[in-house]
From Swiss-Prot:
Sequence similarity: Belongs to the universal ribosomal protein uL2 family.
One Gene Ontology term of the molecular function aspect: RNA binding
Organism name: Arabidopsis thaliana
Name of protein: Large ribosomal subunit protein uL2y
PANTHER family: LARGE RIBOSOMAL SUBUNIT PROTEIN UL2Y, RIBOSOMAL PROTEIN L2
Phylogenetic lineage: Eukaryota, Viridiplantae, Streptophyta, Embryophyta, Tracheophyta
Domain of life of the native organism: Eukaryota
Gene symbol of the encoding locus: RPL8B
């Protein structure tokens, strides 16, 4: 009988494969949407730019005055390129179009570069949050109160115009362009995230450890496609693949055009 394979062990979410979240600074979110942001603006001060282990983009600690009490509200924002300690940020419908300010999509002109975009009104930021990412406002539809946005993947999405976004591009762009050069650097990179490195190929394993393992030379030995309802220990390879192999003919031509 074979062993419990790596994919099954990861799915069980045991202590070995849990994300290393104990040293992270906290969730990076906008302020909770309130009356002040819907109708005017609130002023905040960037008190610190910090590194968050396990995240590529830096974070900004922003202090706001509480709208009703004599106290300060401290928030963690994903930092935009060009933000600095001591900068004043403005969040709300009537805020200016400046890097780091947070406005609803309906108040942002077409062609503007934005980041940390809400997917649903009040969800406090969901799209274009990785280091160097940005989205672009394409068009507004005043009849349906929606805005068309081009995402970092290149896909275009229609969002409610009341969704908020930060002006600018996420800081930390070009982080992945520097080569790791040695295994030790990769080890420390992934140690801050989770246990997902190094990745051993299935064909390099013994047959007891993986369905692709074993043999006098490294080969799968059977079709690598598996059906969707396959048992967990055999569900490896190309799962429920519609097709395999490189595209040929008209399909390849259409795919090449879509890349440009």
């Amino acid at each position: 009988m074979g062993r419990v394979i790596r994919a099954q062990r990861k799915g069980a979410a045991g202590s070995v494969f849990k994300s290393h979240t104990h040293h992270r600074k906290g969730p990076a979110k906008f302020r909770s949407l309130d009356y002040g942001e819907r109708n005017g603006y609130l002023k905040g001060l960037v008190t610190e730019i910090i590194h968050d282990p396990g995240r590529g983009a830096p974070l900004a600690r922003v202090a706001f005055r509480h709208p009703f009490r004599y106290m300060k509200q401290k928030e963690l924002f994903v930092a935009a390129e060009g933000m600095y300690t001591g900068q004043y940020l403005y969040c709300g419908k009537k805020a200016n179009l400046m890097v780091g300010n947070v406005l609803p999509l309906g108040s942002i002109p077409e062609g503007a570069v934005i980041c940390n975009v809400e997917l649903h009104v009040g969800d406090r930021g969901a799209l274009a949050r990785a280091s160097g990412d940005y989205a672009i406002v394409i068009a507004h539809n005043p009849e349906s109160n929606t805005t068309r946005v081009k995402l970092p993947s290149g896909s275009k999405k229609i969002l409610p115009s009341a969704c908020r976004a930060m002006i600018g591009q996420v800081a930390g762009g070009g982080r992945t362009e520097k080569p790791l050069l040695k295994a030790g650097n990769a080890y420390h990179k992934y140690k801050a995230k989770r246990n997902c490195w190094p990745v051993v190929r299935g064909v390099a394993m013994n047959p007891v450890e993986h369905p692709h393992g074993g043999g006098n030379h490294q080969h799968i030995g059977h079709a690598s496609t598996v059906r969707r309802d396959k048992s967990a220990g055999a569900k490896v390879g190309q799962i429920a693949a519609r097709r395999t192999g490189r595209r040929r003919g008209a399909a390849a031509t259409l795919a090449a055009k879509a890349d440009y």
